[in-house]
Amino acid sequence: MNAPEPVQGKPRKRYDAGVMKYKEMGYWDADYEPKDTDLLALFRITPQDGVDPVEAAAAVAGESSTATWTVVWTDRLTACDMYRAKAYRVDPVPNNPEQFFCYVAYDLSLFEEGSIANLTASIIGNVFSFKPIKAARLEDMRFPVAYVKTFAGPSTGIIVERERLDKFGRPLLGATTKPKLGLSGRNYGRVVYEGLKGGLDFMKDDENINSQPFMHWRDRFLFVMDAVNKASAATGEVKGSYLNVTAGTMEEMYRRAEFAKSLGSVIIMVDLIVGWTCIQSMSNWCRQNDMILHLHRAGHGTYTRQKNHGVSFRVIAKWLRLAGVDHMHTGTAVGKLEGDPLTVQGYYNVCRDAYTRTDLTRGLFFDQDWASLRKVMPVASGGIHAGQMHQLISLFGDDVVLQFGGGTIGHPQGIQAGATANRVALEAMVLARNEGRDILNEGPEILRDAARWCGPLRAALDTWGDITFNYTPTDTSDFVPTASVA
């Protein structure tokens, strides 16, 4: 956008009518020192050819706070110097001369307390379609403690969940029922029973199983909870199955959640695509009803995967922790879905840290104090199997749910054998780690030793032991070690 030239050499004043450059309207301040109470955002921007990156950064700050395309006299009726967002730093992205990192500070008073919907309406509501910018991606955010404290956060959290399940010192195990569409309620319940009886802690609905002609939601809930209760009685362990309450209206979702509660379920599930207001509402319901809330990140790849445009999943994970989910899918790094190992570990930091430290190699550009919000249990799911157990535990530690869907239900000896294979592999690896062995390097040997005494594990390793998904990740961390303000 080209601003008019000054008339007869006279400099334009801030509130003269007409179009001005954003950086001249106060949306760029290279000397600005962010305050502890500022909300900070890092954008990756690709300006149009010929557009000054500083002007592009100022435009992002302006269009995500108080600016419009022309000077408006009503600015003078506000405390506009405070309400203007301020771009304060621009760095070139390494090895990409067209892209720039721009840092923007927002005054806390610009945002409604405890509302992710309001936050996202400002930060991503308008700037991503702004013509002077070819592409924009929200890479990271820092929330001030005062803002974090306006959110309730997870209703259960990792510690309380483990206490309810009475399971400590190891990752939890789960599986998604497959095929995810087409089973009758009775057959669906049978799959759940076999998986839980074989040694899994959880079974799970997939993202698109709701209430279809082949299986009404009420039938699924009834057969699943019958399976959960029978498996719990048979094993002496607390078991659960994520019942997906996603529906077309909020009222229907509450109705399904209430029915799940009446059947004794300990956990329900919603999809990311239901939206932020719905997610926060279901979190509040779970808090009031002592339920765990699992979040399936359905649809996230439409805006998180591309490196030059969209929203990084680390930002989505931060919003979800504020919104109050107890579980969220965060990637596997070794499975079938997109995920650079270091970047994925950064997502796990966001879920589990009390205080997240800046770590540029993991894509974490800001320190974040979580102000005593409970921690989210990350979930690794998608194309993983027992032969990768050493890699998964080395990458993610104990506080994670490892979900083996096809790696359980596709077992050549049946579903219960698949679950047993995963449980034995997990127990063997945790034991070896606790004995001080190098499980990352000795993992295959540890698994083969355990398989000598476990036929299901031996069959799993013979079937999938050499299966890997070695593709180059599209979303990796870029960073600038030192500032180079334009």
From Swiss-Prot:
A Pfam family the protein falls into: RuBisCO_large_N
UniProt keywords, alphabetically: Calvin cycle, Carbon dioxide fixation, Lyase, Magnesium, Metal-binding, Monooxygenase, Oxidoreductase
Site (Transition state stabilizer): 336
Cofactor remark: Binds 1 Mg(2+) ion per subunit.
Enzyme class: lyase
Active site: 178, 296
Catalytic activity reported: 2 (2R)-3-phosphoglycerate + 2 H(+) = D-ribulose 1,5-bisphosphate + CO2 + H2O; D-ribulose 1,5-bisphosphate + O2 = 2-phosphoglycolate + (2R)-3-phosphoglycerate + 2 H(+)
Protein EC: 4.1.1.39
GO biological process, alphabetically ordered: reductive pentose-phosphate cycle
Family of the protein in this entry: Belongs to the RuBisCO large chain family. Type I subfamily.
Misc. comment: The basic functional RuBisCO is composed of a large chain homodimer in a 'head-to-tail' conformation. In form I RuBisCO this homodimer is arranged in a barrel-like tetramer with the small subunits forming a tetrameric 'cap' on each end of the 'barrel'.
Subunit structure and binding partners: Heterohexadecamer of 8 large chains and 8 small chains.
Record's protein name: Ribulose bisphosphate carboxylase large chain
Organism: Cupriavidus taiwanensis (strain DSM 17343 / BCRC 17206 / CCUG 44338 / CIP 107171 / LMG 19424 / R1) (Ralstonia taiwanensis (strain LMG 19424))
